[in-house]
Amino acid sequence: MEQLSSANTLFALELFQTLNESSPTGNIFFSPFSISSALAMVILGAKGSTAAQLSKTFHFDSVEDIHSRFQSLNAEVSKRGASHTLKLANRLYGEKTYNFLPEYLASTQKMYGADLAPVDFLHASEDARKEINQWVKGQTEGKIPELLSVGVVDSMTKLVLVNAIYFKGMWEEKFMTEDTTDAPFRLSKKDTKTVKMMYQKKKFPFGYISDLKCKVLEMPYQGGELSMVILLPKDIEDESTGLKKIEKQITLEKLLEWTKRENLEFIDVHVKLPRFKIEESYTLNSNLGRLGVQDLFSSSKADLSGMSGSRDLFISKIVHKSFVEVNEEGTEAAAATGGIATFCMLLPEEEFTVDHPFIFFIRHNPTSNVLFLGRVCSP
């Protein structure tokens, strides 16, 4: 499980960097876990350099028996009985006249719980699009009503892979609504906006990375299996969002080191955190292309013959939509698709005032998997 969670986190950080290049000061929010799961289903049917490029980009080449690892991980992450709701849903929508190999369909069903829904892309692509959107809307409790916009599928579409993830968790320590006030949030050294700032003082795992001048706070959700971890620069020191130094230095090893429970101290923290809601939509072709996935999107080069027995399939688009809402009660989120740090001695009480841009992620603690990763520059 550890190999897979490292692979997923490594991919998460690399994708974050390409999204950051496209939008250096905008909000970012996505589910690396959802994207990795969806592309792992593609690898099941990929051959040759198509498969090799995918394995390398997603770092699956360092994981033994990738598909059964995903099977265990999906079961572990979405097991029933937890005090939060975390739902993973996979489905393949295939052109009904097209012959997919029974072995491929059996494998995606067994490893990813993804069944094939036959639809009529050829004669009724708009109906097929609506059907796919309806299903995703149901799986994400209405938070992602339109995964595929008009024109994304047409009569030439053979296959749409859909992966949706939905999370709703209550804070272990809730914020009281009466403590929420209007407060300024600094977007940069020059600009501010007014936000609804929540407040509480409780004991939380807290750390300070001195060489980065960055505070780390972990806020667990009820049940303790999931946490939100926030990386907050002490101040805005660059001419942009204040996050440039962290974004430059962040690696898999450093992130694990900075945010490990044993490196944080459980102390009283005055937490001020804005309410926020972010919805993002990405077509990931060019981002994945920059990370090394080339052949998959090319009708002449893609080899998905493990899905159909022939070489006429390729993936035209990978669309990922995500949603997160953080308030006094907790968090609702959905998505469809080193150096050792030196920690400082802390005071008995710390201030954690999130009044400028920050990076956050939602982690499944038992497996250390990053389910969602984001940056808030403007809540």
Curated annotation (Swiss-Prot):
Protein keywords: Cytoplasm, Endosome, Lysosome, Phosphoprotein, Protease inhibitor, Secreted, Serine protease inhibitor
Post-translational modification Phosphoserine, affected residues: S300
Record-level GO BP terms: cellular homeostasis; inflammatory response; negative regulation of interleukin-1 beta production; regulation of innate immune response; regulation of protein catabolic process; type B pancreatic cell proliferation
Single GO molecular function: serine-type endopeptidase inhibitor activity
Disruption-associated phenotype: Mutant mice do not differ from wild-type in growth, litter size or life span when maintained in a specific pathogen-free environment. However, they have increased mortality in association with late-onset failed bacterial clearance, and specifically increased neutrophil death. Mutant mice also show a severe defect in the bone marrow reserve of mature neutrophils demonstrating a key role for in cellular homeostasis. In addition, Serpinb1a-deficiency leads to maladaptive beta-cell proliferation in insulin-resistant states.
SUPFAM superfamilies in the cross-refs: Serpins (SSF56574)
Site entry: Reactive bond: C344, M345
Main location: secreted
Ranges where the record places region CARD-binding motif (CBM): 351-379
Tissue specificity of this protein: Ubiquitous with higher expression in pancreas, spleen and bone marrow.
Pfam families xref list: Serpin
Residues that span the membrane, as ranges: none
UniProt-listed InterPro entries: Serpin_CS, Serpin_dom, Serpin_fam, Serpin_sf, Serpin_sf_1, Serpin_sf_2
Cellular component GO terms held in the UniProt record: collagen-containing extracellular matrix; cytolytic granule; early endosome; extracellular region; extracellular space
Cellular location(s): Secreted; Cytoplasm; Cytolytic granule; Early endosome
Subunit composition and interactions: Monomer. Interacts (via C-terminus) with CASP1 and CASP4 (via CARD domain); these interactions regulate the activity of inflammatory caspases.
Biological role: Neutrophil serine protease inhibitor that plays an essential role in the regulation of the innate immune response, inflammation and cellular homeostasis. Acts primarily to protect the cell from proteases released in the cytoplasm during stress or infection. These proteases are important in killing microbes but when released from granules, these potent enzymes also destroy host proteins and contribute to mortality. Regulates the activity of the neutrophil proteases elastase, cathepsin G, proteinase-3, chymase, chymotrypsin, and kallikrein-3.
Family, similarity comment: Belongs to the serpin family. Ov-serpin subfamily.
The protein's name: Leukocyte elastase inhibitor A
